[in-house]
């Protein structure tokens, strides 16, 4: 018999309710047939997404691509968050962690209360989102020669070791005089750096302890701001087998700067200690336009990037860490004063109550948004109700 179908657009155009009715086929005439009612089936399909993309956990194989604990919070009110892990714990929300986003789309499942995600209920079993920056060329860095004056084993251009192979104590009379603490503590700290005891940096790299301005270039062994105050000139900073470390109350600020993290050992990591102060914006032009941090895709070993700074409120641009985990454990909001921030990482680990704020004021920002991120995501149609 003919089907009777009724379709109705509901929820402000975001959903469609379809009702299908059919009269049953009867084999007995008379009163028995008259008592059989029509069969009706209802279904509602909702459209979600289609907004800006500002946070992606890339790995499909991790137990949890977005792991949040201890009152950790993500505030991305006008953009979408994607977790590509297909595990049942793809998004983990433990100990009062919560997410506020326009869309949360999880390839696997959710461990924790779905009510911790607002204002919309998170979607599970979403198709993983392909890395939107996979075709973005890495910056042209040439042969990675250490062309900066602050090469490995140097402080402000001076030799770190004396002719006898011991720490040059004369340096304590100059730039090191600005380091907090006594002379003994300064010596101990520098010796730790030399021996590679700092997390993420086996090579000492450039060690900055006073107030200075750095030029773009290749920094073999990375840049270590130990209680210093560093202003970066615009350009690309290539960190080869050593990361960007800011600790002991160190300050790092720069406009129109981009960091390319490279080196086969995977030692070029971000290490922002709790006492550090960070303010950075990505380049406006060039092969790093819009890219604040760009991690080499071919790193061999996995060392986490750590953002624990309690004063890193201005991070404008895209942070791209496809091979490693980004750990966020600051006590104060991160990136909340930025025009926009986009983060794409292999995995996110948030604990100890941090609040990550992902703004989307792309139109007002002078920093371009890289193609593939910050753009509108594809809408997702999902069956919401069936009766």
Regions found by a protein language model. Give the residues of each.
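Short amphipathic secondary-structure patches
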Residues: 1-26, 112-113, 170, 192
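Well-ordered beta-strand segments characteristic of repetitive beta-sheet solenoids
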Residues: 55-58, 79-84, 101-107, 206, ...
């Amino acid at each position: 018999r003919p089907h009777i179908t009724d379709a109705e657009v509901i929820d402000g155009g975001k959903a469609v309710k379809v009702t299908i009715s059919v009269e049953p086929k009867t084999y007995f005439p008379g009163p028995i047939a008259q008592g059989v009612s029509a069969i009706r089936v209802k279904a509602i399909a909702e459209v979600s997404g289609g907004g800006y993309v500002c946070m992606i956990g890339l790995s499909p194989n991790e137990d949890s691509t977005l792991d949040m604990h201890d009152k950790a919070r993500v505030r991305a009110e006008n953009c979408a968050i994607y977790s590509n892990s297909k595990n049942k714990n793809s998004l983990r929300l433990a100990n009062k962690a919560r997410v506020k986003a326009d869309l949360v789309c999880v390839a696997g499942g959710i461990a924790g209360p779905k009510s911790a995600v607002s204002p919309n209920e998170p979607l599970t079993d979403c198709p993983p989102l392909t890395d939107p920056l996979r075709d973005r060329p890495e910056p042209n860095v040439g042969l990675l020669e250490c062309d900066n004056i602050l090469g490995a084993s140097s402080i402000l251009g001076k030799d770190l070791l004396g002719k006898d192979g011991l720490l040059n104590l004369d340096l304590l009379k100059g730039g090191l005089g600005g380091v907090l603490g006594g002379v003994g503590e300064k010596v101990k700290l520098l010796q730790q750096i030399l021996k590679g005891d700092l997390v993420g940096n086996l090579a000492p790299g450039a060690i900055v302890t006073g107030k200075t301005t750095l030029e773009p270039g290749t920094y073999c062994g990375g840049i270590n701001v130990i209680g210093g105050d560093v202003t970066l000139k615009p350009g690309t900073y290539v960190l080869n087998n050593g990361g960007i470390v800011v600790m002991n109350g160190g300050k790092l600020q720069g406009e129109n700067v981009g960091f390319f993290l490279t080196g086969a050992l995977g030692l070029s990591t971000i290490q922002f200690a709790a006492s550090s102060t960070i303010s950075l914006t990505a380049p406006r032009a060039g092969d790093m336009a819009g890219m604040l941090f760009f991690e080499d895709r071919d790193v061999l070993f996995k060392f986490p990037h750590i953002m624990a700074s309690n004063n890193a409120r201005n991070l404008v641009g895209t942070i791209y860490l496809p091979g490693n985990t980004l750990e966020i454990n600051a006590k104060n909001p991160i990136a909340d004063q930025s025009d926009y921030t986009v983060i794409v990482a292999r995995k996110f680990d948030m604990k100890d109550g941090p609040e990550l704020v992902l703004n989307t004021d792309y139109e007002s920002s002078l920093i371009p948004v890289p193609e593939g991120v910050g753009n509108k995501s594809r809408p997702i149609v999902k069956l919401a109700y069936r009766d």
